[in-house]
UniProtKB/Swiss-Prot annotation:
The keyword Transferase applies. It is an enzyme of class 2 (transferase). It comes from the Bacteria. It comes from Corynebacterium glutamicum (strain R). The keyword Glycosyltransferase applies. This is Nicotinate-nucleotide--dimethylbenzimidazole phosphoribosyltransferase. One of its GO terms (molecular function) is nicotinate-nucleotide-dimethylbenzimidazole phosphoribosyltransferase activity. The active site is at 313 (proton acceptor). The gene is cobT. Catalyzes the synthesis of alpha-ribazole-5'-phosphate from nicotinate mononucleotide (NAMN) and 5,6-dimethylbenzimidazole (DMB). Belongs to the CobT family. It holds the Pfam family DBI_PRT. Keywords: Cobalamin biosynthesis, Glycosyltransferase, Transferase. GO terms for biological process: cobalamin biosynthetic process. Its EC number is 2.4.2.21.
Length: 358
């Protein structure tokens, strides 16, 4: 399988609409550019939808991809792998941070268990955990193809159900190690540059994490032009499914609000699977994980928030969602200078007042 067999060509947001949005924003009752990034976000959503003003975002959806990671047995996390399944149940029961944020922002949460370490099977399952990426492949070829198919299918389901913006989230002990390995591989960054503290590891665990990431990156050193092979060897079922979900959202012309390092690592993979997918991304926030800034730079994304968050689950992106909605609502609900009877700015070509030089 090659990416072109799985994903259709990504079309870019409407550049003509994007060019027209500046004039539209400048007609609103405010000095040009005075709403800063809110103007940029609103213009982006207009281009994604192909209309000015954009439709209000009334059907956002958070999809959390959950899976365990074999590399977690190497001492790279402060928590045991059993926490993954326990937290998945917490999300299902509505008690996690992402549930609270989702309720506050009027967003629904869907949990996808691709590879948590328990006996279960279903349409969204790939495996029970996955290989330890420092010494073995994360998945077989059959498993990676299944993970990609699952992620693509879920994106289609959500878009077909009317989602107007998608927020992927992550859950799984050890997933920041996998994410850092992917970021290092795609950006050519050194392991020590992309390794953070994850769940709060000490110095010894940090060294183990660096070692695991170094070994994983070495295993794919000759495969940088083969994203599916990279996914098979050093990602995981949950990250591969998430990458396919993000890629297919772009194919379906649906903006994706990115969360932290794990989601953004999957977004790097998505942009390899479906070139140009990054044109449909908004960075919700910047996490404290070093690899996240490296990945954001590689995707040329400027995050909305910098709150020092690093939880995952889609929490940072979901927290930024109200800013995106506000950006859209401003374009819909603000008066223009003409409709409000407010004088606009002086014509730029008008003669400037004389300066008093005395």
């Amino acid at each position: 399988m090659v990416p072109a067999e799985l994903f259709a060509r990504v079309e870019f947001p409407d550049h003509k609409i994007l060019a027209q949005t500046k004039d539209f924003h400048d007609s609103l009752t405010k000095p040009p550019g005075s709403l800063g990034k809110l103007e940029q976000i609103g213009c982006f959503i207009s281009a994604c939808q192909g209309q000015i003003p954009p439709r209000p975002l009334n059907n956002s959806k958070i999809v959390v991809f959950a899976g365990d990671h074999g590399v977690a047995t190497k001492g790279v996390s402060a928590y045991p792998s059993s926490v993954s399944l326990q937290m998945a149940e917490n999300i299902t029961n509505g008690g996690a941070a992402i549930n609270v944020i989702a309720r506050t922002t009027g967003t629904s949460v869907r949990l996808i268990d691709t590879s948590l370490d328990h006996e279960a099977w279903g349409d969204e399952r790939v495996s029970r955990s996955c290989g330890s990426i420092d010494v073995e492949d994360a998945m077989t070829q059959e498993q990676v193809e299944r993970a990609l198919e699952i992620g693509k299918r879920i994106a289609d389901q959500e878009v077909d159900a009317g989602a107007d913006i998608l927020i992927p989230g992550d859950l799984g002990i050890g997933n920041t190690t996998t994410a850092a390995a992917l970021v290092g591989t795609f950006t050519l960054a050194e392991p020590v540059v992309v390794v953070g503290r994850g769940t709060g590891i000490d110095d010894e665990a940090w060294k183990l994490k660096v070692s695991a990431i170094r070994d994983a990156m070495f295993r794919v050193r000759d495969l940088r032009q083969d994203p599916i092979a990279i996914a098979r060897k050093i990602s995981s079922p949950d990250l591969a499914a998430m990458a396919a979900f993000i890629a297919q959202a772009a194919v379906r012309r649906t903006p994706v609000l990115l969360d932290g390092v794990v989601v953004t690592a999957a977004a790097l993979l998505a942009n390899k699977l479906a070139p140009g997918a990054r044109r449909w991304f908004i960075a919700g926030h910047r996490s404290t994980e070093p690899a996240h800034s490296v990945a954001l730079d590689a995707l040329a994304l400027d995050p909305i928030l910098e709150f020092g968050m690093y939880l995952g689950e889609g929490s940072g992106a979901a927290t930024a969602l109200p800013m995106v909605k506000i950006a859209v609502d401003l374009m819909n609900d603000m008066s223009t200078f003409s409709s409000a009877g407010v004088d606009g700015p002086l014509n730029a070509s008008s003669e400037a007042p004389e300066q008093n030089t005395e």
